[in-house]
Amino acid sequence: MESPEGAGPGEITKEVKVPQAAPSVPAHETGDTCHTPVAAVEEEVGIPIPAPGFLQVTERRQPLSSVSSLEVHFDLLDLTELTDMSDQELAEVFADSDDENLATESPAGLHPLSRASCLRSPSWTKTRAEQNREKQTPSDPERQGTIVDTFLTVEEPKED
């Protein structure tokens, strides 16, 4: 039997329409291959049904953020409580990046604070002694009047 596309001008092709069971079920037609079941359903129901195998993008939005694999956001490093900070090399990496931030944040004309007079002390550079001191009871007279700050003043040794 010859296909409908190969039919000559003198030949008659018969098109038979198969009744649909439900509007959501695509109809399968025989005969003309140019007429798709999607178009038949769309004409009857009015809702376009996508052809299988195609992805339809209904909405586009901007990405939430973009960070290159080589770039590390400094604020995210503060979330390293689960990291083993007893590793001295790792603590030095964080301390070095903190020094770079202090140098770049200083406005023109002002000198950054010298390392000898003021140290920035984020949570990842605290020593075990400082952590143990913080675990003391709040009734401790030394702890009552102090306020924890991100900058700690370095006291020079007292001369006797």
Curated annotation (Swiss-Prot):
The encoding gene: Dbndd1
Name of the protein this chain belongs to: Dysbindin domain-containing protein 1
Keyword Ion transport annotated: no
Entry keywords, A to Z: Phosphoprotein
A GO cellular component annotation in the UniProt record: cytoplasm
A Pfam family per the record: Dysbindin
Keyword Transcription regulation included in the entry's annotation: no
Organism the protein comes from: Rattus norvegicus
Biased composition (Basic and acidic residues): 127-143
Family to which the UniProt record says this protein belongs: Belongs to the dysbindin family.
Location of region: Disordered: 1-34, 95-160
Modified residues (Phosphoserine): S3, S97, S121
An example Gene Ontology biological process: regulation of signal transduction
